[in-house]
Amino acid sequence: MNYSLHLAFVCLSLFTERMCIQGSQFNVEVGRSDKLSLPGFENLTAGYNKFLRPNFGGEPVQIALTLDIASISSISESNMDYTATIYLRQRWMDQRLVFEGNKSFTLDARLVEFLWVPDTYIVESKKSFLHEVTVGNRLIRLFSNGTVLYALRITTTVACNMDLSKYPMDTQTCKLQLESWGYDGNDVEFTWLRGNDSVRGLEHLRLAQYTIERYFTLVTRSQQETGNYTRLVLQFELRRNVLYFILETYVPSTFLVVLSWVSFWISLDSVPARTCIGVTTVLSMTTLMIGSRTSLPNTNCFIKAIDVYLGICFSFVFGALLEYAVAHYSSLQQMAAKDRGTTKEVEEVSITNIINSSISSFKRKISFASIEISSDNVDYSDLTMKTSDKFKFVFREKMGRIVDYFTIQNPSNVDHYSKLLFPLIFMLANVFYWAYYMYF
């Protein structure tokens, strides 16, 4: 029994030793393979100073950039900015990282902390962040000739100065500008790798309210107190899709104007109906005007195209309400004039009788005076009183004629002319409005 256990133990020991020998040989072969295909990072960075740029003290580092625009998630008129997610790729030469062997190899993103990288920042950026899911979205790749590729995935909110005077028929020009934070033109020079072809993705974007008309790249210089810096500029034009606003604002406001014209076909005597239509359309237009401004900046420097149109519509709606007030007032004046005509005839008869009686009284007094002529016995008070009443009547008649000159003789004509003039003037206003804002 002891002999059998001893034999089994010896066999197990021999098997274990054999496996260890094979494993060590495999590790040696793998290690040799790694050394042949990839340079040792520790050997490559031996004596490497990440705080000094390549060619330190010599020619500036040439950094070539490319951009992929993944998305433009929002464009805010109220904040005057846009938010975009971009893939930023930078390439430069670092002679300290030249190696022999394979064409290139990719390092773990955490090793970027041991290398020199440009201090590129986004000009006019309000806030930016680097994506960290599931790890930091960074890539570092080394090429055998010393070229370094450094890629980042960034979401940034960038300021964009907008001219909203033609809103919503406007075209906005926004920029994405890249520049070195600390290295001026003597240390770092930025360039686009392939000109306009250095930017990709914009032509495939689909935005809610905009269409990207065109874009182009520029290389400019930024003169600041700390030096002269190279700045890369991506400039793109955004044309707003006006169809959305036509359906949301222009069509409802136009329908409200047309609805206000319905009152022209309603009788002047239907006071509640016409008043209700006028007040309702005015309040609806006011609500529409307030709602159109909720998503826009509350500044006094912009009189937008949509404000002009809503102002025109409000003027026509309010004008229709005033038209009924004028027509109804004229109707009341006409009825009052008829009553005054009847009263006038009665007053004329009364004045004639008064004058005749005054003349008769005067004649009688003259006959009495023929018996005994005495100026003290003649009484002119009755005649003077009746004559002043006549002057008052003549004055009222003159004033009445002046008022009648400015009074509408036939109130029904007000509605008749309004049926033609309101639609005609509104159509002419639309022609001038759309021609100006679409083509000028």
From Swiss-Prot:
Its main location: membrane. Pi subunit of the heteropentameric ligand-gated chloride channel gated by gamma-aminobutyric acid (GABA). GABA-gated chloride channels, also named GABA(A) receptors (GABAAR), consist of five subunits arranged around a central pore and contain GABA active binding site(s) located at the alpha and beta subunit interfaces. When activated by GABA, GABAARs selectively allow the flow of chloride anions across the cell membrane down their electrochemical gradient. Pi-containing GABAARs are mostly located in peripheral tissues. Glycans are attached at N43, N102, N145, N196, N228. Heteropentamer, formed by a combination of alpha (GABRA1-6), beta (GABRB1-3), gamma (GABRG1-3), delta (GABRD), epsilon (GABRE), rho (GABRR1-3), pi (GABRP) and theta (GABRQ) chains, each subunit exhibiting distinct physiological and pharmacological properties. GABAARs subunits share a common topological structure: a peptide sequence made up of a long extracellular N-terminal, four transmembrane domains, intracellular or cytoplasmic domain located between the third and the fourth transmembrane domains. It is found in: Cell membrane; Apical cell membrane. Residues 1-23 form the signal peptide. Most abundant in non-neuronal tissues including the uterus, ovaries and also expressed in lung, thymus and prostate. Expressed in the hippocampus. It comes from the Eukaryota. GO terms for cellular component: apical plasma membrane; chloride channel complex; GABA-A receptor complex; plasma membrane. This is Gamma-aminobutyric acid receptor subunit pi. NCBIfam families: LIC. Belongs to the ligand-gated ion channel (TC 1.A.9) family. Gamma-aminobutyric acid receptor (TC 1.A.9.5) subfamily. GABRP sub-subfamily. It is a multi-pass membrane protein. Residues 24-241, 291-301 are extracellular. InterPro entries: GABAA/Glycine_rcpt, GABAAp_rcpt, GABAAR_pi_TM, Neur_chan_lig-bd, Neur_chan_lig-bd_sf, Neur_channel, Neuro-gated_channel_TM_sf, Neuro_actylchol_rec. The chain crosses the membrane at residues 242-262, 271-290, 302-322, 420-440. Disulfide bonds join C160-C174. Residues 263-270, 323-419 are cytoplasmic. Pfam families: Neur_chan_LBD (PF02931), Neur_chan_memb (PF02932). PANTHER family: NEUROTRANSMITTER GATED ION CHANNEL. It catalyses: chloride(in) = chloride(out). Changing H416R: In a breast cancer sample; somatic mutation. Allosterically potentiated by alphaxalone. Allosterically inhibited by pregnenolone sulfate. Inhibited by lanthanum. High sensitivity to inhibition by zinc. The binding of pi subunit with other GABAAR subunits alters the receptor sensitivity to modulatory agents such as pregnanolone. GO terms for molecular function: GABA-A receptor activity; GABA-gated chloride ion channel activity. GO terms for biological process: chloride transmembrane transport.
